[in-house]
Design a protein with these regions (language model features):
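Residues on the lipid-exposed face of transmembrane beta-strands in outer-membrane beta-barrel proteins
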Residues: 14-18, 53-57, 94-98, 141-145, ...
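Residues that define the transmembrane beta-barrel architecture of outer-membrane proteins
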Residues: 47-51, 88-92, 135-139, 166-168, ...
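Outer-membrane beta-barrel translocator domains and adjoining extracellular loop/strand segments
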Residues: 10-13, 37-42, 83-90, 118-125, ...
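Outer-membrane beta-barrel "beta-signal"
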Residues: 238-254, 259, 268-289
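Single conserved hydrophobic/aromatic residue that forms the stacking wall/gate
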Residues: 1-12, 16
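Transmembrane beta-strands of outer-membrane beta-barrel proteins
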Residues: 23-27, 70-74, 106-108, 153-155, ...
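Transmembrane beta-strands of outer-membrane beta-barrel pores
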Residues: 29-35, 57-59, 76-82, 112-116, ...
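Short loop/turn motifs that connect adjacent beta-strands in outer-membrane beta-barrel proteins
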Residues: 17-24, 60-71, 100-105, 150, ...
Length: 289
């Protein structure tokens, strides 16, 4: 059937008052039609109206305290279906962010979550979430060492209910700036999900390593490797950029996808699922006046 202009459009508005100390707010409303096409890129949802986001109060700690600043906020949003104005999903909860004088940051968050699923979805071949309406909660904490340190670390953890089950999530993100020419960053994420009433479990380990080097101002390289136990795959990306002069760039990019568990399906999977080599050269012309 023909779609109205409203179905094919998207609109958004926001009002805010941002400040370091005292009360502030960030409020927004977005409407996306059911037939909306962004033209470039994509949208995760269509046919919804979203309302959010937060009110907060910030204050500076006393001079004798080891903390520098506090920010206490109430965050929340809701998604309504345009078709019948029914509630699709919602989230609300407080957050407390503490900035230390050393540069470290501690964040504590609590959430109450609602999801109405018209379709089931799979986490893996052995775990799924069925159709239904769910209310669950989550408690999380994160701690970040000062980003100015040569060695950095961010640790995160969360636990709570998850649809009709439970969830535990742990994460570590280390970083090491050896020099201005070489930097290592990593990330490890563990997810443990249990649905005891349905005897379904899901565990995943995701590990990432990124190496950046700038041998000279004109020559730099980046290497990225990721392992995901949920799909038993390793993704690698290597990129070299050579910039001999302003407006002239040469890129060499190599991508590879490896299967770490080749015998989980029949027929057996290949060791390399995908491998590409891309060479790109760009030059910017300047037209004289």
């Amino acid at each position: 059937p023909p779609r109205s202009t409203l179905d094919r459009s998207s609109a958004a508005s926001d009002v805010y008052k941002r400040q370091v100390e005292g009360f502030g707010y960030e409020l927004s409303a977005t409407r996306v039609g059911s037939a909306y096409d962004p033209g470039v890129g994509y949208v995760q949802r269509t046919g919804f109206t979203r309302i959010g986001d937060r009110i907060f109060k910030g204050w500076t700690a006393p001079s004798e305290s080891s903390t520098l600043r506090h920010l206490l906020s109430m965050n929340g949003y809701l998604f309504l279906r345009n078709e019948d104005r029914s509630l699709e999903s919602a989230e609300i909860g407080p957050e407390w962010k503490i900035d230390a004088k050393s540069g470290a940051v501690l964040t504590l968050t609590a959430k109450a979550i609602y999801e109405d699923l018209p379709y089931s979805f799979k986490l893996s071949e052995s775990a799924h979430v069925p159709v239904g309406s769910y209310s669950f909660h989550d408690l999380s904490a994160s701690y970040r060492l000062p980003i100015s340190n040569m060695v950095r670390l961010t640790a995160k953890g969360s636990a709570g209910s998850f649809y009709d089950g439970s969830r535990l999530s742990l994460g570590l993100s280390p970083g090491w700036s050896i020099s201005k020419h070489l930097e290592f960053t990593g990330n490890y994420q563990y997810e443990r999900i249990r649905f005891p009433d349905r005897a379904e479990n899901f565990d995943s380990h995701i590990a990432r390593l990124r190496v950046e080097t700038a041998l000279t101002p004109k020559l730099s390289a980046i290497a990225f490797i990721q392992y995901n136990s949920a799909v038993d795959r390793v993704i690698s990306n290597f990129r070299i950029r050579f910039n001999p002069k302003e407006g002239s760039d040469l890129y060499i990019v190599y991508n590879e996808l490896l299967n770490t568990e080749r015998y989980r399906h029949m027929p057996n999977m290949p060791l390399r699922d995908n491998r590409t080599l891309l060479i790109k050269y760009s030059y910017t012309f300047t037209l004289g006046g």
